[in-house]
Amino acid sequence: MEANEESLKGKIEKLEGKEVIVESKEDEMDIIIEENREAEQEVMEVKARDGRGEQNDVLMEENNNQGEQKDEEMQDASSRSESSDFNSDEDEQILSRRDDELDLEKPLSEEEIDELISDLLAVESKAAEAQEALEKESLSKVESEVREELAQALRGDELDEAVAAEMMTFKDEWEATLDELETESATLLEQLDGAGIELPKLYEMIESQAPNGCYTEAWKQRAHWVGTQVTKETVESLANAERFLHTHRPVRKRHGKLLEEGASGFLEKKLADGAVKESLAGTSELDWSSLNKVFSEKRDESVSFGSKQWASVYLASTPHQAAAMGLEFPGVNEVEEIEEIDASLADPFLADAIDNERELALTEEQKTNYIRVKEEDDITCDRVLQLRLKRKRRKKRSKQVIRCAAENMDDDSVYLDGNNTTPNFAKDQVKSPETSTQVHNSEVNIEENGNFSNSDVDKMTPSTHINVDAKRDDSQNPANNFRCTACNKVAVEVHSHPLLEVIVCMDCKRSIEDRVSKVDDSLERHCEWCGHIADLIDCRTCEKLFCASCIKRNIGEEYMSEAQSSGWDCCCCSPIPLQRLTLELEKAMRDKKSIELSSDSSSDSSSDNNSVDTDADVNVTISSKKKSKKKIRRIIDDAELGKDTRTKIAIEKARQERLRSLQFSARYKTISSMGDVKSIPEGAEVEVLGDAHSGYIVNVVREIGEEAVRVPRSISAKLKVHQVTGIRFMWENIIQSISRVKSGDKGLGCILAHTMGLGKTFQVIAFLYTAMRCVDLGLKTALIVTPVNVLHNWRSEFEKWMPSEVKPLRIFMLGDVSRERRFDLLTKWRKKGGVFLMGYTNFRNLSLGRGVKDLNAARGICNALRDGPDILVCDEAHIIKNTKADTTQALKQVKCQRRIALTGSPLQNNLMEYYCMVDFVREGFLGSSPEFRNRFQNPIENGQHMNSTAEDVKIMNQRSHILYEQLKGFVQRMDMNVVKKDLPPKTVFVISVKLSPLQRILYQRFLELYGFSDGRTDERMRKNFFAAYQVLAQILNHPGIPQLRSEDSKNGRRGSIVDIPDDCSSDENIDYNMVTGEKQRTMNDLQDKVDGYLQKDWWVDLLQKNNYKVSDFSGKMILLLDILSMSADVGDKALVFSQSIPTLDLIELYLSRVPRHGKQGKFWKKGKDWYRIDGKTESSERQKLVDRFNEPDNKRVKCTLISTRAGSLGINLYAANRVIIVDGSWNPTYDLQAIFRAWRYGQKKPVFAYRLMARGTIEEKIYKRQVTKEGLAARVVDRQQVHRTISKEEMLHLFEFDDDDEKSEAVTEISKQNEAGHSNLVEQAILWTKKATLSRVGGDKLMENLLQRHGPNWISSFHEHETLLQENEEERLTKEEKDMAWEVYRRALEWEEVQRVPFSESPVVPKPSPSTQTEPLPQPKGFNRSRFVNRNCTRIAHQLTLISQGLKVGSSTVCGECGRVIRWEDVIPASKLSAVIVN
């Protein structure tokens, strides 16, 4: 024993002298965390290396055991632990391929024992540190630091909640770390015990040195239970226990291994008679109770590690016994059960084991954590852990070599941390996770024999980033598996190439951006991919250059050979060869979940990086997982934007300044020539000149000497006032002036955001005829890309509005020729000129070279679409909402900058979609996406919730106003207010419908069964949100729909989901970069999930046979059928919209049972009394149904059933004046379009719409979300301040069921038993109906009857939808607040402009003289204030206006901002006028 002790002391002293023992606790934890990652990486490398040599053997073995493995997997699925960290396919492969390396039976060498002891010392040291970190003293210190840091931004209860959340996360992280360390410690102890090391002596030495490494007072002064003097009572109890064990359980050991167990009390207990059993059992209880009594009597909950209670953990053999002894350590409440044993119960050992299992009494928490495991699971876990520890020791030896080599390296090669000479490969990730330094673009190579390869060390560069998650493993970094396509090095941080959709590292991205930002023509030509200047190859269709190495390395040698021999189309012109690299970039970006792009990604310029780094101090403490209202970061200044963005803003400002000055001149001429302002058409802009007989003039704002351009007379005669305004708006942006176009100006883009029904198609046709036929501008080709379902409508509109006085435009369509002749058709279009109509799908495929077999033809088509159009028009442009979609990328490849985006709903879901569309027409105007998030999206969305603070609302209004003002020059918005007087009134009722008892039961069971009501919906909601929503929506329509779908599936019919594809990724600004293929896969997965939910048997026991045939189980169906019946009685036609095909099928079933009025025994028939339009309806058949429905003589048809997505766009059903929306869409635009199918030109009756909404369910929350989206659009596009209707918390808890019906039903039952109560209930219902009828039915007799019939039984409440979108006067910005917000926005840009003015042109500005005043321009009565807002401009602004127009002393002009006449004499003192005269 003494020899072993001396040997052990020598080994510890030897290890203490080695450099392997780390110098600080922080470094120890760093090594532990980093080496786990490196061990996993090495396992993968070994796996790949060995896999090549052993591939055949492994494949043979897998083929032989494939059937057996499948059976075992099916049998063991229920017993496999979900929480197992090691039972994975990867670990099994590692073990199967590395058994020769593991060799657990081989005796350990002295060196390996030294390493094990070293590892144990490190693990125990970190475990002690973890325990100290969880002491009250340590926690109090950390809490005070956290509170002090958070107190800078938070106060009161909010501060307390934030501190509590941070501390909870802090403790959880340390407890998890402690749990991992204890697992490692147990494995190491087992190996040391097997090697013959006396563990008590080892622990005695560890404990004797423990106080020297403590930093808390509690641990420095604690009484150690090992190696210290204990009480006599404890010694006596231990001696009694030892004597009992020696008597009843004699054992013989050698080197710590159990060699033999004699006829102990266990065998005697099995084989002896009952009396002996009772005697032994009693003796055991008496012997052990004395020791347990010692611990139980002096138990103190406040006693921590190192006390007697801690020592008692070694006496507990089961978690139950540990819990009974009062131990509250990790693992106490985790109970594992061995798998079922197939054996005879006659075996006394098995029988006793089973009896013990049955008698096991577990606590509630232990029952919750009850896990069933297999015996091989434990073996696999053990072996994998030992393998990882062995590899970690090898890595530690390699680190010694790195340290030695690092001392001889230059300081420039290694990034040093303070005075420490060791390369900082791993910063502290647990205790101080503030920054981390990583090795960039290199992997240090270490041979098995310890040799160090420093070939790549000189390429190391530091990269600092914020570590958001203190426990995150570096192996999760998506850059670990990706290389930079420019420098071919491992990218520590994955970034997108500024020009190509491929992966580049940070250094390469910055280098490329610096080259792009330098527009000096004298610079050397360089590769657009990597920036090199050697071996460049020209693109034959554009001016871009690419080096041969980039082409060869990234695309392939074959492509390189072809490029050198016959020329090539570069990756910008033909991105098809980059598809693989683009997919890699998408994968890397999706894996980068822990870092939010808006706050941590690099901006497009160095100034962006500075703006991010100079933000308010970022909270880098361990963040809480609790979601709450965002705390937005500092809004970056406009001076910090990229150079390109600032340039485009300046161009737009100069354009508006020029237009304003010319507009005022035109206004003066108009007023003087007309004499009477009243003669100006009401509602039109003041600058409207010309008339319908001679043709409206489009270039009212024109330069001196420029001829007037008129709209053709035949078209002008049919234009309305707002349409004339829209044509002029497009001219001012697309053309600007005749001289500019002829001088080669590329023009600008715009968005015509007129709401549905205002004639956007007619306006575009009029504009194209004016620009391409009425004046010679050299513009002869136009490309119109539109949804395929309105493609033929465009052609018919061109034919309908064809003018007679000018040559008609040629119209081309792909359907006019065969596929083989498409290239010829496009060539003819480019040569002859005209308008080419094309669907989005065909445009995308042809632009990307898809669907064309002939390679030359494919290239020709791509070139024609890219270079051919002089004007590009995109109908329904809100489709352009995904920056990474193929359609968006194809449209952006078109070189034409004269782009017109048509949309009735420019902002549908979120601001990022709006940004995508704006960035298409004016690329770079709003900056990069992170800049837009910081400046507009986050402030606006953060202030639109009910629980937003006053400051949030104020910032929201300011940023909304600034965004509106910034975009109003090229985004023209008009709503139905301009034509309200031409249409009958419209009323939209939102009816809150109660659920039937069966619906409530099904709804609650689904939520509980699939975990949507347990408060743990974060990950589940993300994966299964829309599938669950579809199931619930169908239950809310009718509880029998699952039954109906089940029968349809048995008959081979499958109900489709209509209203899903674009909604899945457009609501919370997430996945807006999802590629098209992924979206289609998401759609298919969604359909499968919905079918899976409905095909399971969770609803079978609740539904009786043919429940779906009874309409009374759904309040929606009762109200729907009643509305249709009453509409038919009064002669009104109705439209019924629903999202799902099964719901429409069920409605058709009920309609087939409705009796015909006055026809005994006759019922409604499809095709006679109702029509149906869905996605399966052919285009020709659809138009026939629409025409028949709109026929005034067709009195028999009562309604048309329409699927929301398939029929809410592109059809006119003005014959109907009743619209019923059975289930609201996630996107409010679809429901709005559904209503506008009836409320449009041609409608003669008042329109009433009924939106049925299930009360207290997800439908009600989604409706509030719709109002939020419409309010967001109103704020940004329509500049209204609407009421906020939903809180952030409601948005995160959409599945919560607010079921008050059970309470109301209980009250109803009680009242029914009481006669007086019953009469009161009837009187209350009558009073409720009268009150609602008198106040809110809006003159709709049908709604009044509906309330009287279904009052409180089915209708919970109702309101008019428009009331929620009325402007909130309290939140409207005053003129002063608007001016202040706009002035703050313009201040940086104006200051930059002043700095750019030459000294000779910027006279000194004196202090304003009180005697100097400007005379305002007299405003006519018809002056439109919505366009020209009076402002108080500065003298500097007036000076800049005078300079920009080149005016001299004595001349005057009108300021486009404040509307004042300005002269040099008014803005500069007389003493300074001489300088202006000279200049």
Curated annotation (Swiss-Prot):
Pfam families: Helicase_C, SNF2-rel_dom. One of its GO terms (biological process) is DNA repair. Residues 40-109, 594-615, 1400-1423 are annotated as: Disordered. Disruption phenotype: Slight sensitivity to gamma-irradiation. GO terms for molecular function: ATP binding; ATP hydrolysis activity; DNA binding; helicase activity; zinc ion binding. Residues 472-601 form the ADD domain. A motif (DEAH box) lies at residues 875-878. Residues 19-49, 109-199, 578-598 form a coiled coil. Belongs to the SNF2/RAD54 helicase family. The ADD domain predominantly interacts with histone H3 trimethylated at 'Lys-10'(H3K9me3) (and to a lesser extent H3 mono- or dimethylated at 'Lys-10') and simultaneously to histone H3 unmethylated at 'Lys-5' (H3K4me0). The interaction with H3K9me3 is disrupted by the presence of H3K4me3 suggesting a readout of the combined histone H3 methylation state. Involved in transcriptional regulation and chromatin remodeling. Facilitates DNA replication in multiple cellular environments and is required for efficient replication of a subset of genomic loci. Binds to DNA tandem repeat sequences in both telomeres and euchromatin and in vitro binds DNA quadruplex structures. May help stabilizing G-rich regions into regular chromatin structures by remodeling G4 DNA and incorporating H3.3-containing nucleosomes. Involved in DNA repair of gamma-irradiation-mediated damages. This is Protein CHROMATIN REMODELING 20.
